Amino acid sequence: MKILLGCDVDPALPAPLTRRPEADIWQCLDNVERFVDAAGAGLPPITWLIRADESIRFSTDRFDSGYLSKQRLWQSLADRGHELGWHFHLMSFDHARGAFGFDADPAWLSSAHRAIGAHFAVRATRTGWDYGSDVLLRRLDALGIVIDFSALPGHIGWQWAGGDRLRIDWSRCPEIPYHPSSDDYQRPGDLALLEVPITPFVNSAVGMIKRLGWRLRNGSGSIAGLRNKTRMLTQPWEALPSSPSPVWAFFFHPEDLDRHGIEEGLRNVRRLQTLPGAEFVTASAVL
């Protein structure tokens, strides 16, 4: 069994984002250094997906400031067998509203990819809010991305992107890795990109009822995936998940790495290490 760990390397940004922040948005990356130090030699390889998008350029004048702010750290991790990848949020500045909002097909995507790709080979992605669409996966495939691990099997949810509310839908995708169809991102098809779903945990009966109620309040009566629950690596796990997938994938964020998050994350890593045949891999090594 392959185990894939990813970190969405997000900064601290205000919401809504209407003007350039005065504070250092990347100060939260100090948490990553504390996590790495606490883990020591026991840290398995992780895929660090550094955020590069229009909101980052707006806030720092550069798409690649997340890499440059901790270049020595990222290079050190890469030298230890970790992988660097790309994370982004599909938002563009809406001049009419004077703030960032959701943009399903942003003009800046290729430029952000090129900027971060000047520092390392960009092979892996995770999307902001775990968002997926036919248009997005086709564009990632065209950019040469070989692994995306954003899918949440059975998940239907709603997120705020600036002042816009968007629906996240992975209700029909499989739990095992698949090459998406160019005209249906939730079904196997013709894209070269491999989608590796995040491993779901088992939801409680009460949790399933609450989730169905949430869906109904948002206009969806779908019962798909009610038994699935997403847990981050840094959250308490009551039990290990059970999945037929040959790849178990989990994620976390720098902001999750307070003392409690670091302790839980390392505890969960140790639990995964006890699984028979467990092999921790980076995203590219899934292939």
List the model feature ranges, each with a label.
Residues T127-P244:
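Active-site-adjacent pocket scaffolds in enzyme catalytic domains
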Residues A12-A15, S55-S59, S92-A96, G132-L136, ...:
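Short catalytic/ligand-binding loop motif for oxyanion handling, primarily in non-cytosolic enzymes
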Residues E22-F35, F63-Q71, D105-S111, P174-Y178, ...:
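Well-ordered, non-membrane alpha-helical segments in soluble/globular domains
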Residues G42-S133, A151, P200, A249-F252, ...:
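Metal-dependent polysaccharide deacetylase catalytic core of the NodB/CE4 family, i.e.
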Residues G221-L287:
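C-terminal domain-boundary segment and adjacent tail
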